[in-house]
């Protein structure tokens, strides 16, 4: 360290901070009569590329993505009950949440290859893949 400064990140991109993000949501609701209501919504989330490691490793960043979600529901107009189908990440985007190098992986690679350094191993944790759920609410 020089003058107590361990790492100077001046001008560097912050980890986990995309340059742009957007969210668009559309909601629709309609009274069907006979005490029934139908509603639906669609949401779109976008993100530009961002780093998922604190050391800003370009080998394991998250590229830009667009993620879609939707919901449709049918229920009573008094809110007593509601049946919904909910979908998230409908286009099944693979979104890295966090990642980095695997500790000691370089050492194991060296040992397995007879001493030659073949590279660095990376791992990542991903957000949930496409999922669709059915939900029933009943208020007593």
Predicted regions located by residue number:
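C-terminal extracellular loops and terminal segments
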Residues: 1-69, 126-128
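C-terminal beta-signal and adjacent terminal beta-strands/loops
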Residues: 44-53, 74-140
């Amino acid at each position: 360290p020089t003058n107590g400064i361990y790492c100077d990140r001046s001008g560097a991109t912050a980890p986990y901070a995309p340059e742009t993000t957007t969210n668009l949501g559309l909601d629709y609701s309609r009274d069907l009569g006979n005490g029934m209501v139908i509603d639906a919504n669609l949401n779109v989330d976008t993100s530009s590329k961002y780093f998922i490691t604190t050391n800003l490793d370009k080998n394991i960043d998250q590229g830009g993505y667009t993620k879609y979600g939707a919901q449709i529901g049918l229920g009573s107009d008094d809110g007593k009950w509601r049946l919904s189908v909910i979908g998230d990440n409908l286009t099944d985007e693979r979104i890295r949440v966090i990642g980095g190098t695997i500790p000691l992986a370089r050492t194991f690679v060296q040992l397995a290859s007879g001493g030659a350094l073949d590279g660095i191993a990376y791992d990542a944790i991903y957000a949930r893949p496409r999922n669709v759920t059915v939900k029933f609410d009943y208020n007593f």
